[in-house]
């Protein structure tokens, strides 16, 4: 499949052929329909924040194409939007309604000794925020997805994952509006 890969800091993104694994456990394979370019993606591309090579893109929306055997929150055919919150769903903070303060966000990723979700020529690619939406498909933990109405346009849905929640969080939690 094609993905927009950042190979080194300060370089341009490049369209490349990459491999994507089959979904395991609580992973969901999403056919990406829209992905926004956020300023955070540009910061990742120009500052030493995340490893390269990487597939960024955290404002992502698409259609569920396949699910791992333990997935319970989405079904094939659902329209979904990705979330920045990498939350395990089982720690005290997640269970008290604070998934953004999850104590075990690594639970949404594959273990280092597992095969990578994304790879190129056998080498794993970093998946920005566990999403990697700058690709034709993305393999994402179910806790990082929210189902949206099928009538919602994908371009608008993609904005929900970062821009809208960031703005709403500032208005509701900081400005107390």
Map each language-model feature to its residues.
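Extreme N-terminal starter segment of soluble prokaryotic enzymes
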Residues: 1-2
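Conserved hydrophobic "DFG−1" position in protein kinase catalytic cores
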Residues: 5, 20, 44, 139-140, ...
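Short N-terminal binding/cap micro-motifs at the start of the first secondary-structure element
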Residues: 11-15, 39-40
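Short Gly/Pro-enriched turn/cap motifs at secondary-structure boundaries
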Residues: 19-20, 51-57, 125-130, 136-137
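Glycine-rich beta-strand-centered segment in the early N-terminal region that forms part
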Residues: 21-35, 45-95, 100, 147-151
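Histidine-centered active-site/metal-ligand motif
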Residues: 39, 58, 169
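NAD(P)H dinucleotide-binding glycine-rich loop of Rossmann-like/cofactor-binding domains
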Residues: 88-177
């Amino acid at each position: 499949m094609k993905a927009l890969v950042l190979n080194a800091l300060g370089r341009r993104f490049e369209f490349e052929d990459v491999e994507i694994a089959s979904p395991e456990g609580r992973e969901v394979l999403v056919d990406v329909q829209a992905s926004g370019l956020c300023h955070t993606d540009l910061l990742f591309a120009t500052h030493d924040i995340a490893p390269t090579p990487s597939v960024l893109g955290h404002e992502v929306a698409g259609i569920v194409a396949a699910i791992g055997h333990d997935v319970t929150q989405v079904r094939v055919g659902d329209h979904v939007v990705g979330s920045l919150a990498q939350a395990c769903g089982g720690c005290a903070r997640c269970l008290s309604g604070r998934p953004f303060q999850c104590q075990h966000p690594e639970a949404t990723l594959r273990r280092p000794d597992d095969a990578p979700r994304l790879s190129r020529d056998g080498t794993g690619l970093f998946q920005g925020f566990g999403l990697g939406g700058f690709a034709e498909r993305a393999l994402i933990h179910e806790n990082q997805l929210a189902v949206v109405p099928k009538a919602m346009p994908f371009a608008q849905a993609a904005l929900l994952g970062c821009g809208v929640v960031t703005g709403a969080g500032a208005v509701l939690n900081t400005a107390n509006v």
